[in-house]
Amino acid sequence: MLDYNHRPTCAERINAVIDKAIAAERAAVAPRTYLGGSRLGHGCERALQFEFAGAPKDEGREFSGQTLRIFEIGHALEDLAIRWLRGAGFDLYTRKGNRPDGEQFGFSVAGGRIRGHVDGIIAATPQLLGIGVPALWECKTMNARNWRKTVAKGVVVAKPVYASQIALYQAYMEAQVPGISDNPALFTAINKDTAELHHELVPFDAGLAQRMSDRAVRILQAMDAGDLLPRIA
């Protein structure tokens, strides 16, 4: 009798155990107990409210092993970008004291209920570039389609969530790094498919930062009052 049942290939079996290990590693990380500044540009405040409350994902909507691998590859590429910029003469600080064991730069407000961690702070650049410092540095990895869109339209139009993060971080980091909001942030986008790099100077948008801060306060107030914010599809 012919057996038409699919039998996992060697690659599928290996990937399955890898994904299981990655998922277990992620599950062991304590969940966030704060509103992350990197997420406040999301269009749906109810979704952000659910994230802050630690609501479990709908069944079948958990991150797949492949998605978790994509996240980790993004972090690895960010580390490469840091090395490349430093090698090119950028004085780029990613941790306090620029030590591997140093704390990541970031901010904490509203009793620790709103927090953010920055990718880096630029203290100096090659003089010929004419980039003002200190400056915030934020790095994202993208597939080719999203990368091309960002190059063509700019991060503010193409990726408003990222633009919101940049503005908020410039505002809240001013207390720790005076002058950081006076200078445009440097946004780096890495094309994961081709290794092309896009760099863009993003001036501080005080109005956008204020709107994101107001949104965070609105979410916290709704949580404290037990109210459910409107859902935006």
What are these model-predicted stretches?
Residues 54-55, 140-145, 190-194:
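Short connector loops/turns at beta-strand edges and beta->alpha or beta->beta junctions
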